[in-house]
Regions:
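Nucleotide/pyrophosphate-binding catalytic subdomain
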Residues: 1-216, 384-385, 400, 404, ...
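Phosphate/diphosphate-binding glycine-rich loops and adjacent basic-rich segments that engage nucleotide
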Residues: 134, 192-193, 202-260
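Short hydrophobic alpha-helical runs that function as membrane-insertion/retention elements
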Residues: 168-172, 226-228, 291, 372
Length: 411
């Protein structure tokens, strides 16, 4: 007998019918002899509905009261799922985040988990109950309710699995696993049987929405085996674990991409690290996420800096740079929108030199201009024209043989 933590996202519990389906997944694990802790999100789009209600009353709601409001969404789901299990003859009890011992820092809207008192959950498990826990929420030392921000239910599930020393954490979603790339754009995309923590973390940070980066980081730090599974089809999903446990036959394991990227170039800066520090510190204070950065210095010691931002952040970026023009002393700002970022990810790059060269050769063959490049040990990212995005992904997917990936079930 083992302990399984299951997590069901909003789309997987979006109706009473889907909640019944989730209950059957729980029952299957109980029938297999496992103890089960279930973490759930708010039903469907109910969090958006709550946000809209607040907006009807005020343009600037208190962050504390927003956390109080949003935390009610998961409370609906936990009670309904517990009822569904009880109706099938299985003893179940629902807990809010704070009842489950989820202790966080005192930050409203994006709190981090600092400790978990798992004693109450263990007590109920020992009594033979299924414990249903509200994701996305916790409580600070001063007893204020907090929420964990985007991906908070994933993080709750992984944190509980770590604290309880669970054998596994299953993340149920509306997709059957992690794919080599987005199958909505590339029909030859294949489901991966396995992927390493590091690869999944890169893909998550690059916008692959299956798992939140914070949850993957938690799983890696505490060595929690994760499986992303379909809440609809009863089949194996994608197992996320250490690289040493996996087949290492793939140089590239996945391709991530996102559009709505803009390149900003600040021309004619006086060279010096203090100038660069001023630019990026100022942008960071405005919560502008700067991605790829390229610096060039002319023979006359003039510096230009190019960097990419989300297109939604462009106007704020330009506004900040213009405000500090006197301090920065640049000549002009140039921008280029309608861009996209395409990234290849794979632990096999570490021991296979020449992957970036192959990527650029493939893109050149397709007459796709590469405007910016960024690399890490297991990732190469390029910025290309938005109109070339899907063509680039398809070409790279084909070149690295990702359509031939086997989705063989793991044990």
């Amino acid at each position: 007998m083992g302990l399984i933590v299951q997590k069901f996202g909003g789309t997987s519990v979006g109706s009473t019918e889907k909640i019944r389906n989730a209950a059957e997944r729980v029952i299957a694990e109980r029938e297999a002899g496992h103890d089960v802790v279930v973490v759930v999100s708010a039903m469907g789009k109910s969090t958006d509905v709550l946000v809209d209600l607040a907006k009807e009353l005020t343009d600037d709601p208190s962050k504390r009261e927003m956390d109080m409001l949003l935390a009610t969404g998961e409370q609906v789901t936990i009670s309904l799922l517990a009822m569904a299990l009880q109706a099938r003859g299985y003893d179940a009890i629902s807990f809010t985040g704070w009842q489950a011992g989820m202790k966080t820092e005192h930050v409203h809207g994006n709190a981090r988990i600092v400790d978990i008192d798992e004693s109450r959950i263990k007590e109920e498990l020992s009594a033979g109950k299924v414990v249903v826990v509200a994701g996305f929420q916790g409580i600070a030392d001063d007893l204020h309710i907090t929420t964990l921000g985007r991906g908070g239910s994933d993080t709750t599930a992984v944190a509980l699995a770590a604290a309880l020393k669970a054998d596994k954490c299953d993340i149920y979603t509306d997709v059957p696993g992690v794919f080599t790339t987005d199958p909505r754009y590339v029909s030859s995309a294949r489901k991966l049987a396995g992927i390493s923590y590091d690869e999944m973390l890169e893909l998550a940070n690059l916008g692959a929405g299956v798992l939140h980066p914070r949850a993957v980081e938690f799983a890696k730090n505490y060595q929690v085996p994760l499986e992303v599974r379909s809440s609809i089809e009863n089949e194996s999903g994608t197992l996320i674990e250490e690289e040493s446990s996996m087949e290492q036959n793939l140089v590239v394991r996945g391709i991530a991409f996102e559009d709505q990227i803009t390149r900003v170039t600040v021309c004619g800066l006086s060279s010096g690290l203090s100038t660069l520090s001023t630019i990026f510190t100022t942008l960071a204070k405005q919560n502008i996420n700067v991605d790829i950065i390229i610096q060039s210095v002319t023979s006359t010691n003039q510096t230009s800096i190019s960097f990419s931002v989300k297109t939604d952040d462009l106007s704020k970026t330009v506004e900040v740079l213009e405000e500090y023009k006197g301090a920065l002393g640049y000549e002009q700002i140039e921008t280029e929108s309608k861009l996209a970022k395409v990234s290849i990810v794979g632990s096999g790059m570490v021991s296979n030199p020449g992957v970036a060269a192959e990527m650029f050769a493939v893109l050149a063959q397709k007459d796709i201009q590469v405007k910016m490049v960024s690399t890490s040990e297991i990732k190469v990212s390029t910025v290309v024209g938005r109109d070339d995005m899907v063509k680039a992904v398809e070409a790279l997917h084909d070149a690295f043989d990702l359509s031939k990936v086997s989705a063989a079930a793991h044990s």
